[in-house]
Amino acid sequence: MTKKVVDIVNFNADASCLSSSIWMEALQGGTNSKICQWLSLFVRNKKKITLGIIGSTLADIKKYNPDAINIINDKKDVFEIILRPWSHDISLYRTDSLFIYNVELGIKSIKSEFESVSNYYLAPEFMITSRQIELIVKMGIEAIFINPERYQNDIKKRIIPIPHLVYG
């Protein structure tokens, strides 16, 4: 296993901390929009970044600013796209079938827009259950990003603080 530090951007416009009006404003203006300016900073500075874009957020980008998708596709050496679900919610409360549906719909939307997608999954809020890890593995996903700080203390202390492989 190699060790590499990467910047990961959890990109979800349906976050409770972002108003719809600010998000829609960020998409306006084509290549001069705030979102394209932000993406261009990474390109200009040759700063690699891993983007995890929620499927519903990607639908907004596709409709209101496809130029942003073009920038990402044109600069695969800068942008790494990872898998996300369609909806950004607390997946801990989902049934197996709805969890799978949400993830599959997100993956389908991401793969339909981006030419190069890593087989790594970023769960909403970095939270996922043991059962959902099993479901993700069955989907063929290679890796999952987890943030121990999002879990209760009794669970958090059981999560190994370094990248690791899980078997079983």
Short names for language-model regions:
Residues 31-42, 102-110, 132:
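Alpha-helical packing segments of well-folded alpha/beta enzyme cores
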Residues 124-168:
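Active-site-adjacent pocket scaffolds in enzyme catalytic domains
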Residues 5-9, 49-51, 81-84, 119, ...:
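Hydrophobic faces of well-ordered beta-strands that scaffold small-molecule active sites
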Residues 33-37, 62-76, 153-166:
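Alpha-helical scaffolding within the catalytic cores
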Residues 52-125:
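Metal-dependent polysaccharide deacetylase catalytic core of the NodB/CE4 family, i.e.
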